Amino acid sequence: AVLYLPKVFDLPYGELLGLSSLGLVLFGLAALPAGWLGDRWSQIGMMVIFFIGVGVGSIIVGMAGGPDGLFIGLTLIGLFASIYHPVGIAWIVAWADKQGMTLGINGVFGNAGSAIAPVFVGLMIDFVTWRAAFIVPGALSILFGIGLLVVWKAGWIRDVTTDRTPTGAPDSSAFVRVFIVLTVTMACTGFVYTGLTNTMPKLMEMGLSAALAASYTEIGIFVGVISGLASFSSIFGGWMADRYSARSIYIVFWALQIPILFFVVSLSDVPLLVALLLVLSFMLAFAAAENMLVAQYTPFRWRALAYGAKFVLALSIGGLTVHLAGWLFDRNGDFAALFTMFGAAAIIAADAAFMLPGGRPKPVEAVGAD
């Protein structure tokens, strides 16, 4: 949509992209209170608010008559979307027998949305109207929230109060070290991942020839296919996270990204598509290990709050990255400087990962989730 709406509202690409900046910042900042409420009130109740709130924001965007309406709707989407990661991930981890694989499968479904969205938006723009691209999913989100509320009140689903498969307590001397490393790596993740996913459609518009992509639908299909294929690396990463240390996983997959990030903007056509697929796959591969680290080094009663703190850092930086990307593009006409920064961030993250503990806590006797 960000490729098409500048023509509708007569705005520069960077300025339109900037309308989502506050929403992306809130996507991160509001994760902390959302996580706290998930720990103190209800995981399911917060997810009901998530679905209904995101749906309302999306419909507002679809009905917008100008930049102000877009800004309000996108900001509401970011605010309510902040609930999912701290509350939803904590809920999933608590129910999981194999946390790594479960997180990996969840990642596939999460990224399936990212894969389908650009295709759906492209189809709506080319064959219906851009407004349908927001109003239709917004209405579905509200209906899903109402459905979740009904099954919750009927007692078919419940909140979780303990891990199904708890792990032994890790060495307390490693707490500070893990916290410092995660602060660095998650900041780098927010910077690179958000910047990559938000600039990928524009990179394709600039780098793909008309023979490959001549319409918004075709660009959307390429973005969707790459996101969809890359999402399967989440399963591989989850499988690895159940067997190997987060330290090894972090180092390998951050290091693999470094050369690609420095050179991707100089590529075009098929080499560009392959490079984007690889770098996105490498980023998604270590997500399960990162989330397991947070779970292993955090008491259950603070679990959602800890995930909230993680996403405050990563997603708030991501929101600023979108603003930076738009500003650099409007000034320079390309993303060369931005991706040089991404490559530098990958080097920093890979180096920081060497400080992580080499092992991982062992599972203790499993207990049922209440």
Q: How should these model regions be labeled?
A:
Residues 2, 177-233:
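Extracytoplasmic gate region of multi-pass secondary transporters
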Residues 244-293:
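C-terminal transmembrane helical hairpin of 12-TM major facilitator-type secondary transporters
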Residues 24-32, 114-115, 227-235, 318-319:
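Residue-level signature of mid-helix packing/kink "hotspots" within the transmembrane helices
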Residues 297-332:
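A late C-terminal transmembrane helix in Major Facilitator Superfamily
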Residues 106-156:
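Helix-loop-helix hairpin linking two adjacent transmembrane segments in secondary transporters
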Residues 29-66:
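Conserved MFS/SLC helix-loop-helix module at the cytosolic interface between two early adjacent transmembrane helices
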Residues 5-6, 37-38, 120-128, 204-205, ...:
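Interfacial helix-cap and linker-helix signal at transmembrane-aqueous boundaries
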